[in-house]
């Protein structure tokens, strides 16, 4: 029996990039940011949830170099490296190009980090921010260079790293699909994203300036994650007055893809609160 999902995929030409994105639903824009080295497929569970899409227009885009968004012309002339500036510009440029009015932005891992920068620099343009697996900084606990070593199968290595970050309680089919997304990544892309995550994107000295009265901040962190642990998120939130923090039991570093149904049980109440704020 055939089943057609309600998700629609499109390409948007923005500056010198051809960006692929998927969307479903209508209402408040909910812009979803994937993790390092992966792509927007991670949010298919959210895109397919009628309880979310009845009130929210869910949009997940692939960053350039990721998924179905190819790198720009001339990409072969230099190594890919994600920075705070390029990441922020990419997100806000995409939102403006699509004409999204004060979207909610939800990001995981590197996306969970960049929402803190968005809270500092673009709070008035956003309705709310949701950080998944958020930490103000992650110490380098391994040398990421070997992920792009010519004697290492980069796809298998990246998949192995991703596997170790997931909960042992997550369903096997979803776990292995998440691993597959990582195994498909382009050479050097995961490493380039980790440059932001582990080197350049340290925001510890500025998070105390975030004003949640301007833009509410919600942080949800899976308990089975040694990269951005609940302790890391708690330490960040403790310095941001008004930020809300929840530990997601039984989930790991990729909650939206490794166990979508369990993750939605935590996400829906947050979205309901955001929606109720709009009505008050």
What function would you assign to each model-found segment?
Residues 213, 219-221:
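Short beta-strand/loop motif that positions the catalytic acidic residue
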Residues 1-31, 52-56, 100-101, 268-280:
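Alpha/beta-hydrolase fold catalytic core
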Residues 140-141, 155-212:
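Conserved alpha/beta-hydrolase catalytic His-Asp/Glu region
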Residues 243-280:
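Catalytic active-site module of serine/aspartate enzymes centered on a nucleophile-bearing elbow/loop
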Residues 223-228:
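Acidic catalytic loop of the alpha/beta-hydrolase fold
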Residues 116-157:
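Flexible "cap/lid" loop of the alpha/beta hydrolase fold
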Residues 17-73:
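Conserved HGGG/HGGXW glycine-rich cap/lid loop of the alpha/beta-hydrolase fold
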Residues 59-106, 265:
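Active-site loop/oxyanion-hole signature of alpha/beta-hydrolase fold enzymes
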């Amino acid at each position: 029996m055939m089943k057609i999902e309600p998700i629609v995929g499109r390409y948007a030409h923005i500056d010198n990039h051809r960006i692929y994105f998927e969307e479903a639903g209508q209402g408040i824009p909910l812009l979803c940011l994937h993790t390092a080295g992966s792509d927007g497929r991670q949010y298919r569970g959210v895109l397919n949830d009628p309880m979310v899409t009845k009130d929210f227009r869910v949009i997940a885009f692939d960053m350039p170099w990721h998924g179905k968004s190819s790198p720009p012309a001339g990409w072969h002339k230099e190594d890919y490296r994600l920075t705070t500036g390029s990441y922020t510009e990419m997100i806000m440029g995409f939102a403006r190009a699509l004409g999204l009015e004060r979207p909610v932005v939800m990001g995981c891992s590197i996306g969970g980090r960049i929402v803190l920068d968005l809270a500092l620099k673009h709070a008035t343009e956003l309705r709310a921010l949701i950080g998944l697996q958020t930490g103000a900084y992650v110490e380098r606990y391994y040398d990421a260079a070997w992920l792009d070593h010519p004697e290492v199968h980069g796809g298998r290595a990246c998949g192995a790293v991703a596997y170790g970050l997931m909960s042992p309680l997550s369903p096997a089919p979803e776990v292995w699909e998440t691993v597959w997304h990582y195994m498909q990544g382009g050479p050097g892309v995961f490493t380039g994203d980790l440059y932001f995550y582990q080197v350049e994107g340290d925001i510890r000295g500025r998070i105390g300036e975030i004003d949640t009265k301007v833009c509410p901040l919600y942080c949800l962190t899976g308990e089975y994650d040694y990269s951005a642990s609940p302790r890391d998120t708690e330490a960040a939130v403790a310095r941001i007055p008004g930020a809300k923090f929840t530990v997601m039991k039984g989930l790991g570093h990729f909650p939206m893809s490794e166990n979508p149904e369990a993750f939605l049980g935590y996400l829906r109440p947050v979205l309901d609160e955001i929606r109720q704020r709009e009505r008050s």
